[in-house]
């Protein structure tokens, strides 16, 4: 028998100390990694509930185990809410991650050796879209599209490659592309060559919900996403699809890839989806894009080059070559100043993937903690200050003090 008042700090002081240290890091550091955000206390409470104890192989109303009547209610709520958010015909909320959601799409529609057409990882795509070391690159014949000389998706070249290679599946979506994607044009190309059209909106999902980024659901056969990042939920994945594909996708998730779903995480997803249906969430996403625009403009004013020259979303790539430092060096220097960011390859990057010539910046997390244009401009200037003198310890100390002054005014959790 367990007593409900027994806490981690009593039973495992070592783990508790690390949790507390991470809590301090999140509160005291400015988070600019585009794929990170802060889940609400309600989302975290749902994920930490007794639902973690329940096995529930199958789907609502069709379970292998008994005693699933309560998790059925929760999972159906999550399904109904995510369908409402995106206007989707059908949805699966069981994927444990975005990568597993993507694997399910490949399993549902393809056989090993089939041809897929996805965005090159070197020009902004994601590793699950055909990177050679990923399952998607090992099992399938991969053809890649990329950017034109304006660093925008080259739709003409994409169309030509689709006609030449006749892929069975075409992928839209990226992990490091700041501009809007023309999903309607993608859909027309896919229809012309008889391909399944799949969109991965892991980065853009929250913006889509709020109307700040185009919604691919009316055009795509299937759409995948993570549930953290801009959706601000727990770590996990979802799949949206046309009703005709529901059976194939559901079978690919279970029993194809997963066994018992994580119902405590699905409960947290349901809570996050309800939050995303609120007017406040739309206002939040509007501020995310405002902050991103201000951040990019400020960095440009400070002499830095933004890939594509602008952002039309929450994210931007910064070319560091003019500063004479690598992305790896910038990440380390900014980390010392308590600004968390990630190194990132830029198009046609001459550096190795673990070094890079750029960094990726995103505004979802700083917007969650309450930053508006003024605080965002200040943050961008602090980033530029570090990049101007990345090896000057006095400079890093001065920036760190300003970071702490700012984060103390805008706590993540009060």
Swiss-Prot record:
Gene3D superfamilies hit by this protein: Aspartate Aminotransferase, domain 1, Type I PLP-dependent aspartate aminotransferase-like (Major domain)
Subcellular location: Cytoplasm
Binding site for (6S)-5,6,7,8-tetrahydrofolate: 121, 125-127
EC number: 2.1.2.1
Pathway participation: One-carbon metabolism; tetrahydrofolate interconversion; Amino-acid biosynthesis; glycine biosynthesis; glycine from L-serine: step 1/1
Top-level class of the enzyme under EC nomenclature: transferase
Positions bearing the site annotation: Plays an important role in substrate specificity: 228
Chief localisation class: cytoplasm
UniProt KW Amino-acid biosynthesis keyword: yes
Signal peptide (UniProt feature, chain positions): none
Gene Ontology MF, one: glycine hydroxymethyltransferase activity
Keywords: Amino-acid biosynthesis, Cytoplasm, One-carbon metabolism, Pyridoxal phosphate, Transferase
Reactions this protein catalyses: (6R)-5,10-methylene-5,6,7,8-tetrahydrofolate + glycine + H2O = (6S)-5,6,7,8-tetrahydrofolate + L-serine
GO biological process: glycine biosynthetic process from serine; tetrahydrofolate interconversion
Cofactors named for this entry: pyridoxal 5'-phosphate
PTM-bearing positions, type N6-(pyridoxal phosphate)lysine: 229
GO CC, any one term: cytosol
Subunit comment: Homodimer.
Role description: Catalyzes the reversible interconversion of serine and glycine with tetrahydrofolate (THF) serving as the one-carbon carrier. This reaction serves as the major source of one-carbon groups required for the biosynthesis of purines, thymidylate, methionine, and other important biomolecules. Also exhibits THF-independent aldolase activity toward beta-hydroxyamino acids, producing glycine and aldehydes, via a retro-aldol mechanism.
Family in the record: Belongs to the SHMT family.
HAMAP family per record: SHMT
Name of the molecule in the record: Serine hydroxymethyltransferase
Organism: Acidovorax ebreus (strain TPSY)
